[in-house]
Swiss-Prot record:
It comes from the Viruses. This is Protein Vpu. Residues 35-83 are cytoplasmic. It is found in: Host membrane. Homopentamer. Interacts with host CD4 and BRTC; these interactions induce proteasomal degradation of CD4. Interacts with host BST2; this interaction leads to the degradation of host BST2. Interacts with host FBXW11. Interacts with host AP1M1; this interaction plays a role in the mistrafficking and subsequent degradation of host BST2. Interacts with host RANBP2; this interaction allows Vpu to down-regulate host BLM sumoylation. The N-terminus and transmembrane domains are required for self-oligomerization and proper virion budding, whereas the cytoplasmic domain is required for CD4 degradation. The cytoplasmic domain is composed of 2 amphipathic alpha helix that form a U-shape. The modification Phosphoserine is found at S59. The keyword Transmembrane applies. It comes from Simian immunodeficiency virus (isolate TAN1) (SIV-cpz). GO terms for cellular component: host cell membrane; membrane. Ion channel activity is inhibited by hexamethylene amiloride in vitro. Residues 1-13 are extracellular.
Length: 83
C-alpha cells in the first residue's frame, strides 16, 4: 500500500478526491466532444445521401447509362454501339 507522508489524512483525502474529480470531468468533456463530432459526422452523411438521391432522381439517367457514359472513349467511338 502507498503511504502518503506529507500533510494530514484529511488533506490527502481531499487532494485525492480533487484529482479524481478533475480526471472524471476531463474524461466527460472528452466523451461529450467525441459524441458531438460523431453526431455531426452522421448529419453530414445524411446530407450527402439526400443530395446523392436528389441528384440521381433529378437527372433522369439510369445508373447503367451513367456507367456507359463514363466509359465513353471518343477515339474508339462507334455510333452503332450506342444505338
Amino acid at each position: 500500500m502507498i503511504k502518503i507522508v506529507v500533510g494530514s489524512v484529511s488533506t490527502n483525502v481531499i487532494g485525492i478526491l480533487c484529482i479524481l474529480l478533475i480526471l472524471i470531468g476531463g474524461g466527460l468533456l472528452i466523451g461529450i466532444g467525441i459524441r458531438r463530432e460523431l453526431e455531426r459526422e452522421r448529419q453530414h452523411q445524411r446530407v450527402l445521401e439526400r443530395l446523392a438521391r436528389r441528384l440521381s432522381i433529378d437527372s433522369g439517367v439510369e445508373e447503367d447509362e451513367e456507367f456507359n457514359w463514363n466509359n465513353f472513349d471518343p477515339h474508339n467511338y462507334n455510333p452503332r454501339d450506342w444505338i
